[in-house]
Amino acid sequence: MTKFHVKLYAKAVESRKLDQIQKDFEKKFNRKIDVSVEYCYHVITQEPELISSNWEKLVTLLSHSPFETSVWKESQLHPEHGKNIEIGPRTAVKTAACTNILSIFESSGIKNVERIERGIRYLVEDDVDVNEFFEIAADKMTEAIYGNDVKFDDESHQIEKVFLIDVLESKQNLIKANEELGLALDQLDLDFYYDFFVNKVKKNPTDVELFDLAQSDSEHSRHWFFRGEIWIDDRKRDGSLMKTIRETLDSSNDNSLIAFCDNSSAIRGFESVCRLRPNDPTTVSPMIAIFPPSHLIYSAETHNFPTAVCPFQGATTGTGGRIRDIHATGRGAYEIAGTVGYSFGNLNLPGLPLPWEDETFEYPTSISEPAKIAIEASNGASDYGNKFGEPVISGFARSFGQRLENGERCEYLKPIMFSGGIGAIDKDEVRKEPCAPHQKVVKIGGPVYRIGVGGGAASSVSVQGNRENQLDFAAVQRGDAEMGGKLHRVVRACAERIGGNPLMAIHDQGAGGNGNVIKELVEGCGVTVKSDTFQLGDESISLRELWTAEYQENDAALVDASLLDALQTISKREKCHVSVVGEVEKEQRVKLLGKSGEIAVDLDTRQLGEREKKVFKLKSAPRVLKKLELPENLTVRKALKRVLMLPSVASKRYLTCKVDRSVTGLVAQQQCVGPLHTPLADVAVVALSHFDTVGGAVSLGEQPIKMLIDAEKGARMCIAETIMNLIWAPITDLKDVKMSGNWMWAAKCDGEGARLVDAVGALCRGLREIGCAIDGGKDSLSMAVTAHGEVVKSPGTLVLSAYAPCTNVTKVVNPSLKAVPGSKILWIKIGSSEEKMRLGGSALAQVYSQIGDDCPDIENFSEISKVFSIVQQLLNREELAGPLRKPIILAGHDISDGGLLTAILEMAFAGNVSIDIDIKPPNQNIKPIDILFAEECGILLEVSNPENVLHIFSEAGIKCQEIGKASAVFGPDAHVKIHVNGHLEINEKLVDLREEWELVGDRLGEFQTNPKSLKEAREVRRTCQKINYKCDFDWYYNPAFIHNEQYFSTAPRVAIIREEGSNGDREMASAFTLAGFQTFDVTMTDILAGHTLEAYRGVAFVGGFSYADVLGSAKGWAAGVQFNESVSKQFEAFRSRPDTFSYGVCNGCQLMAQLGWIGDEEQKGPTVFLDENECGRFDSSFGPVKIEKNVSIMLSGMENSVLGLWSSHGEGRFTYRNLQNFQNLKTNGQVCIRFCDDRGMTGADHGSVKLPYPWNPNGSIDDVAAICSRDGRHLAMMPHADRSFLTWQWAESSEVPWNARFDQKTVALSPWIKMFRNAYNWCL
């Protein structure tokens, strides 16, 4: 059939990208260039009249704003004195954007479009070299230059046929295939497979079988090293590393439910947790409260190789794969929140040379430069989480690159992209059902693409950089968070289904693709898989690619045949494809049949399971170490200036501000604390429900630079850091703590394997001493790269993730100093004698280009247990302060990178207060630099009753020193004074020190944020004092009706409406339920299928990224309403009914603006549009807003209040068709909420058009945050009241003065609940 390639041109919104291109081009080629830009949409269709018959729809969808027509059939860039260069995604694979636009087209009634991709066309001067421009403007791994004849439907691609590798004739043929196919088989593998095919099964393998086995049996997939037989210096180790790790479970509490046997680990949680879920997820149904036993799960993995090759996509797929690990636990589980970590080489930032970075180091072209990894990997992980709807609530970042004393270069050229996540699982879903004949084998999720081919093998080579770049590129996957979200909703719906979970067992697809995941699924049985049952995204896929590609957002599951219809109904509702690809058979044999019946795979799984352990013979190699030599006359102040710029110490604001930290409404503690939202929290905490205060706590620990000195000491310090980060959340018991251990190590390089073995032994011995245990983890043992002929090893790294049940999420302590009168700051040194102040492996050593020869260690683990126990007791104790309660521990922080001085300063930075400190060394011979910069284990406490606390520690035999206090002098007036033994070492303004700490993060921020916004943020940090919240109304009531099913049968109904890509429906449902409504789960699929809104008094349009916001925020969602006549009429009828109300937040706000539900009703059509944030990116923040006098029914009685509120969006800037429209809104009282500053003042109060960033996070004129309809019934707001209606959801909850009025053991309602209660009362 004839296909037509049509080009449409549109206005491009790429000002930030253009600015960066011009700066980068000038820097690299020493010349300024002028650049103009437009979009070009390449539409592949079989319908010649497609454009003309759908022109109005296409203009609406492809124009940037509803206020202008900016789509053309001809290019608007006319190269009279220049030339056009078009850059777009590589044409071999459909992009995630294409998939989402096609979904929008289908919803809008635009048919017969096979593909649509967007290129960016640039107009540059004639003498600009195309290749040079491409190098600056594009990502070579994912983009290409488009010529006029660019093809997206290359029918000349030949499908590669299955072929045999003739191993029966010669082993050399196997060796040749290993090289040509990039299988990364080592000699042991070659010997095994040669014997397997020649002597056991007596046949030649197909290329598909061999490729399958290479991925499934790779180090990445099977962890041979950790399971293998280890010899060190010709002495056999007693047991495998895995055995040693598993044995830690014997010393901890017996609360593990899943350990080392599923996609995530699980521990016992709480017996009865009230949660909302749909009564029937196959259709529209009420949300009902259930009380199941709810357990905690955690999973962590790294995606290092893909991130090295292609940072953005490598990180997106690492995040997506780990999320699927969470939901594919047991028979289906629920993700709640993520953790992240990035380790990269020297940044070499332009204009900011860091004195410890070696200018002579060269970087290979086959992997990305460290600065690009730091920026784009974090962009990728953040983007995926934002679109999926998973908050990122904890993490780390580290940079290292040095030449060690033995002459070796050690640097994170092979980076670490760490992704972890905590979730929940119901008791009945913990165990997978065993496979049994006649069960259906199904694939759920996205279609098959030629991406991620050979990733398991690629990640398992000893040293990266020796393969062809094309093989490495083929192994990198592509992420599609929209599809990931749809897949997750299917799994969650199955697990929540009251009539029985259709999923008997489920595994996520990862390394090895279908070949690996299906073999896992049918272990103990067999299956015949038919290739023509798969949904293909590319018809030219070969059988080898279909069977082994890691194409993302896909799960395999066993389904009871009687429940298959239920699964397919759920999948249709969630718009997620299900393919039945086979049926379980009794014979233990896995077969793959081609379309013509040819056999591509035929493997006896029993024979494959007989493989023996691999044997690893290692040699130890002592470190060459040198004592730390610091410059003579080095002052504390000079040392501090450098230390504050080290990325592991410096501000991580460039990471936290761009990632959602509030979605789900279950986050009780994320990274940012204090009035300036400073990223310093030690522990991350989530609740299991909006109706309870129990949850889970997570902390991370990693100490790789200390491991360079002594692997055993570094491992023990990892334990210490992890536990001292976790200490600030009340948990059930220290022995309930379980950990994931992730090992990133060049273990196959000389000496490194033995060091890894030492570290494992030290870790496990230490954990047994305190009663904690490892219950899962991963390893990445190919952490070396060839750079210009030199092997560069990344520092051996262990990342520990601890998780435990949290008994009360309202009792968490963070590092922000409160400066309460009478409070004091205490220092507790833990685990070693108080005289030891070792600087080896410290930030101070690194910034002077050394590591030293002796690092901190834990010599007494019992002190860790004692201190942990005491702090836990104190977390749950409070004192009366007049009519209110006051906690004993006001603030707390662990001592880690940067040492004691950095920890003290960070607490002051977060609290924005003055501090006066005097530290008394236990020994007069200890130098100030030693005591201030040593990274010995310890904690700092700000306490309200210092005498009592000192006594408690003394009674337990723990030395605790009072070192000073914080004073209620804030911001620009705050001062920092640090004395050591009475001698003044630091005497500076707080804001000056803090800006030194923010400097490197700000420079990294310039690559992703509007420099104007960064400048404004610096000024805000310098002038902010303390946020003054104000609330004069009463909002509290007892929502006991939650437990009364009969109550909801007569309650007013609210439809919680979501579209594909929405992610804020559960928190929205909880808010309205707590207000007294009966809430219903309603999808746009339901409405398009005929479900009406007649029975509802209210509708709520939820937040998220409908269709990934691919054509602009909520544009696809709006099109599904506007271009479907029956839906459009129904929506308009609901809007016009005088007894109805609506509430839209974030994406829902954008939808209401697109539909014209808010704005100036005197003019037809949309008069309000939410444009891109002025900062140029997604922004997540918690800040004050002011509720104005307004006509909204939901905000009645709340006027003049100043309350804290979460904002999380990329396109939230209110713009208007004209200024008169905006003036009418103000005159009519339709502008309901404005952003304000720490004093409760708006830009107008200061005589300005708007407040600076981040007080105004999106740049809206007049600081507008919410607008309602003329009659007040329809309210749309960008910030999230649906994530701020409980006190513990507030980032500043510990500092809100009215919180102590209420018993936190009941539902801790915040003032925002009045919004929802107002709506309820209006309906009565």
Curated annotation (Swiss-Prot):
Its EC number is 6.3.5.3. Mg(2+) binds at D682, E721, N725, D894. GO terms for cellular component: cytoplasm. It holds the Pfam family FGAR-AT_N. Pathway: Purine metabolism; IMP biosynthesis via de novo pathway; 5-amino-1-(5-phospho-D-ribosyl)imidazole from N(2)-formyl-N(1)-(5-phospho-D-ribosyl)glycinamide: step 1/2. It is an enzyme of class 6 (ligase). PANTHER family: PHOSPHORIBOSYLFORMYLGLYCINAMIDINE SYNTHASE. In the N-terminal section; belongs to the FGAMS family. NCBIfam families: FGAM_synt, PRK05297.1. This is Probable phosphoribosylformylglycinamidine synthase. The gene is pfas-1.
